[in-house]
Regions:
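Elongated, amphipathic alpha-helical interaction scaffolds
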Residues: 1-196, 200
């Protein structure tokens, strides 16, 4: 039995063995042991945890299960294929980085992409590479069909102003005056924030 002092370092041994196994084609290969996946700490934009077996009625949350990963793009940013795989990877990492094996079942994961521009190129790649299709559920809400993890796409400007007032107004083209005043008044009614008019001389 190995003690802590003489514990075998398996990963360096594997790396060496792998390179030896592939030495005949080594001129074509580059090996990067313990390659860092990101220059900065990886983080999920928003993680929404739902009580088990609770069905969310709100339109943007009907797809939700117990653990819901959300990727948000600002009005000036666009969603691309690398964003898709990054967020998908985060979901898999979140599932695996738990205390016990399968503590978070894959069946309890969902992924939501929220953006302002319909990602035509990304969806074309997913259709071609992964044979995924897209289904328009209602204004601004789309389901990506064909993966074991439920995935939805939310296009903020296309959301219903009645059903999704807050998200629909989360944009940088609010018209000065009426729209901004109405947005502030609605915030005040919900007591989410308290805004007072500046004192005029």
């Amino acid at each position: 039995m190995n003690t802590n002092d003489d514990k075998i370092q398996w990963h360096p041994a594997f790396d060496a063995a792998l390179q030896i196994e592939l030495e005949d084609e080594a001129e074509y290969l580059e090996f990067e042991p313990e390659h860092l996946l990101s220059k900065k700490p990886m983080q999920i934009d928003v993680l929404v945890k739902n009580e088990k077996d609770v069905k969310i009625k709100k339109n943007i949350g009907r797809i939700f299960r117990q653990y819901n990963i959300i990727e948000y793009k600002s009005p000036d940013d666009k969603l691309n294929i690398d964003d898709f795989y990054k967020t998908y990877g985060y979901a898999c990492l979140y599932k695996s980085e738990t205390g016990d094996v399968d503590q978070i079942p894959a069946t309890e994961l969902t992924i939501t992409f929220v953006c302002y521009h319909y990602p035509v190129k990304m969806l074309q790649r997913l259709e071609y590479d992964k044979k995924m299709s897209i289904k328009n559920i209602e204004n601004g809400i789309y389901y990506l069909i064909g993966d074991s993890i439920p995935i939805q796409l939310i296009i903020i400007p296309k959301l219903s102003k009645e059903n999704n007032y807050w998200l629909n107004n989360l944009r940088n083209d609010l018209k000065s005056g009426g729209e901004i005043r109405n947005f502030i008044e609605q915030y005040g009614k919900l007591s989410l924030i308290h805004i007072s008019e500046p004192t005029r001389p």
